[in-house]
Every structure is written in structure tokens, then in C-alpha cells.
Amino acid sequence: MAICRLRSLFSPSKCKSSSFSFYQSFKPRTFSSSHHLPSHLQNVGFIGLGNMGSRMANNLIKAGFSVTVHDLNSDVLDKFSHMGVATKKTPCEVSEASDVVVTMLPSSAHVCDLEKPFMLDAPVSGGVIAAEAGTLTFMVGGSEEAFAAAKPLFFSMGKGAIYCGGAGNGSAAKICNNLALAVSMLGVSEALALGQSLGVAASTLSKIFNCSSARCWSSDSYNPVPGVMEGVPSSRDYNGGFASKLMAKDLNLAAESAKQAGCKHPLTSQAQKIYTELCNEGHEGKDFSCVFRHYYTGMDEHVDQ
């Protein structure tokens, strides 16, 4: 079962994460034979400085943590170096310099196998906008002891950290969250495109949604119609944000997990089909809200701000 396999990957001896992971570096000078977590984690390593990771690392720096970073992109490392941040050439060097290491990487295949007695899988919700603002929500799986120790890190990068249970539960929660998000985005996009076809402006319909029973994040915070809302991917040709290929990946995980669990999943299957088609048509790098334009053929709007 997909979730069971995820839990096995999040074991202390072989930890891999598709999103954000936290683990306590194994350093003899830090740990006793009982492997108790220290009460204060000041030196933070950060591996993965993409659209999300760079912003999260910046928020840790602003919060006063001593941060050491690594990324395969040398240009990104140069930017952090010019900011006075310590940079390392390898993940191992980051680990040696840190009390705790954070990874923010696109898939499990990108995460190194490292020996670590304490680990949390902690996927995030909120996207680039929340990463920039420091208002992410973390879904956390692992030991309660490690969760308690990591709270200062979470609340330096986000507004909430929800403990979901044992190892792998954070990723399980993230899969379910993104399934609901994908389905809601499809519903909002379909309704707005239909409204346009019936002569109701998407901006007008969005106002109705946002003060009625149809209100949801895809409508009031991440509107998919270009011209309706500023500062979201639809306002910049669907660049930035959460790539359609990543949404398709999460829907594949959700579908596989549902099959293994014996759960009915008709909406998952349909959403999976639509996002796979979207990616196959060349829109895999665009934000997942581009489904409004490239699947439903909805129209841009020009709204007086």
C-alpha cells in the first residue's frame, strides 16, 4: 500500500521525503547513548533552495537561527553566500555543521539516505505565497518528542504545525489535502468557465462564491481566472506556484493509496486523468490552476482594481 510504503521510507535508517523533512543530525558530541533530543536547536542546515525552500530558509534566518545551506544550483548558493549565509558543497557537510537539518526537495528520489535517529516527515501547505510570508501549515509525522523539539523551526516558517501521528502520517495527510485541493480547483474552474459561457463575469461569480456556500481556498485565495485576483499564478500566466506535474504526482499517490486501502475514489480518478492530460499537453510546468485555461478553455478578464 502506498501509505505503508511511505511509512517504511520514513524509518530512522532510511528516510526519504517528497516534500519537507526534519531530522536530527547524528553527532556523537550531541547525543548520549539514549539519543535524547537537545532542548535547543540553533544551528540549522537547509538542503533544497527552490521556490519554496529559499523562502523558508530566509524566514529561519530572519528568526535568528544560524543557517547553513546547500543546493545543486550554484547560482542560488552564490545569492545566499552574498547574504552572509554559510554554504556547503555537499549535504554531508551541511549535516556536520548543524544540530538539525531541513530538506525541501521535489521527490523522494532526491533525498539522501542518512543515518538519523530522529526524523519528522512534515509536508507543507500554502505554496510559494505562504512560504514568502512565513504562513505555511505543516503536517507532521514522527515521534512526539521530535515534534516538540522542532516547533520553533515550524513556527519560524509557518503559522501552524499539526501533529498527525507516527512516521509517514504527515505525508498521508498531505496526499489527502492535495486531493481535496485538486478536486476543489477543478470544481471552481468548471463553474467559473460555465458562468462565463452563460454571460456571468468570473469576477462577479467569484464574489458570489466568496460570500456564500461555494467559498473555498481555490476561489477566495488562489482564483484561477487571469485578471480576477492579483499576486496569484493566474495573474502571471500561471508561472510560479505549484506545478501541474507535482499535482499529478500527488494524485497518482492518492489513487494508488485508495486502491490499496479499498476506498472508492471516483473523483480522484477523474482529477488524475485531467491533470495527466494537462501535463501531456505541455503544461506540466505551469501552476495547477492553469486547468481553468488549458482544460476548460476559460477566458481572461480585465477587472478594474
Place the predicted regions along the sequence by residue.
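Hydrophobic residues within alpha-helices
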Residues: 56-60, 153, 194
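Methionine-biased hydrophobic packing positions in alpha-helices, especially
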Residues: 52, 56, 104, 117, ...
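Rossmann-like adenosine-cofactor binding region
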Residues: 106-114
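NAD(P)+-binding Rossmann beta1-loop-alpha1 motif at the extreme N-terminus of oxidoreductases
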Residues: 2-104, 118, 128-131, 162, ...
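Helical "substrate-binding/catalytic lid" subdomain
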Residues: 169-302
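Short glycine-/small-residue-rich Rossmann-like dinucleotide-binding loops
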Residues: 99, 105-107, 124, 142
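Rossmann-fold dinucleotide-binding core
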Residues: 115-182
